[in-house]
Amino acid sequence: MRSLSIFGATGSIGESTFDLVMRKGGPEAFRTVALTGGRNIRRLAEMARALKAELAVTAHEDCLPALREALAGTGTEVAGGAQAIAEAADRPADWTMSAIVGAAGLVPGMRALKHGRTLALANKESLVTAGQLLMRTAEENGATILPVDSEHSAVFQALAGEDTACVERVIITASGGPFRDWSLERIRACTVAEAQAHPNWSMGQRISIDSASMFNKALELIETREFFGFEPDRIEAVVHPQSIVHAMVGFCDGGLMAHLGPADMRHAIGFALNWPGRGEVPVARIDLAQIASLTFQKPDEERFPALRLARDVMAARGLSGAAFNAAKEIALDHFIAGRIGFLDMAAVVEETLAGVSTDPLFGKVPDALEEVLAMDHLARRAAEEAAGLRQQKR
């Protein structure tokens, strides 16, 4: 029986993964080693019961008594806290879904790779913050990383069986978010509620706002660089409002391979779960005649400066991605709390990158996770200062 673990089980990716696992037979088809979640203890316990999980972990130690009570008599072990989540990743599983949002997903993802099995990576921050270290760890341990972002899953599939030396360019698409047709002045004054209202995808608050600012796409550009290894001048993003084409790969013979799929994360999750084969995934089928037209346009970097900042990070590499991600997370916290404006987020990130770029770690290829965490800590402090100054100016 195939074994699996789901990190971030109660988030949107985790829920979709759980749904697909249950459709494929649940505990009759899989041995669930570990499930982790946040404060939604009721849902985490429901999942653990349904999958007969060996271990359930909440990220919050204060929630542990509730989890223990909810799973009493089931035979499922329970634990709480960041260290417990990291230790859960030390339990070998054939297939691990890494869906914890933010830099918190880096440690369990790294530890899971050391078993030399398959990591389905939905936590883009892992590649952004420690891409070179992550890929090296996978190679050294004979592990496989499968991208779960719809765009990177699309690139992965388009490259199957191809000679990467013949790849001229990789194009990932962006919906443009809720502000794709808004003026700069209107974007500047937007509210949190407006920023989190995504037109195409059903996602959580933070990733929806990242999509609106195109910081999500900026992370994905960096992720493409780190996962596939292409040079920055061969990687680009285009706005594609229909969200049907997820990525395109251009080859040296002039051909352009496009991957089309529904705007449903279960498509990419299902591909990773069924890999190296394919299996039934319950998503809507595309009707091209009904869609009628697919449109593309260049993104406006004045309205969405995150893309420009991403190119700087792609060129610098080293631990610049860790600084970028840390600053982005702090800036997002301040925007959600109403302390800074929408466009201030990019300014905070840019000021943070400038401030920490003189540190020896900034351009260094990391040798250990501790270096990644050190840059993350340094950038978070710098971003807090930058955000505080922006707040004072409002």
Curated annotation (Swiss-Prot):
Gene label: dxr
Record keywords, A-Z: Isoprene biosynthesis, Manganese, Metal-binding, NADP, Oxidoreductase
PANTHER family: 1-DEOXY-D-XYLULOSE 5-PHOSPHATE REDUCTOISOMERASE (PTHR30525), 1-DEOXY-D-XYLULOSE 5-PHOSPHATE REDUCTOISOMERASE, CHLOROPLASTIC (PTHR30525:SF0)
Protein name: 1-deoxy-D-xylulose 5-phosphate reductoisomerase
Family per similarity comment: Belongs to the DXR family.
Protein's GO biological process: isopentenyl diphosphate biosynthetic process, methylerythritol 4-phosphate pathway involved in terpenoid biosynthetic process
Record carries keyword NADP: yes
Cofactor or coenzyme needed: Mg(2+); Mn(2+)
Chain positions recorded as NADPH binding sites: T10, G11, S12, I13, G38, R39, N40, N123, E125, G204
Keyword Methyltransferase: no
Pathway linked to the protein: Isoprenoid biosynthesis; isopentenyl diphosphate biosynthesis via DXP pathway; isopentenyl diphosphate from 1-deoxy-D-xylulose 5-phosphate: step 1/6
NCBIfam families reported in the protein's UniProt record: Dxr
Enzyme class: oxidoreductase
InterPro entries linked: DXP_reductoisomerase, DXP_reductoisomerase_C, DXP_reductoisomerase_N, DXPR_C, DXPR_C_sf, NAD(P)-bd_dom_sf
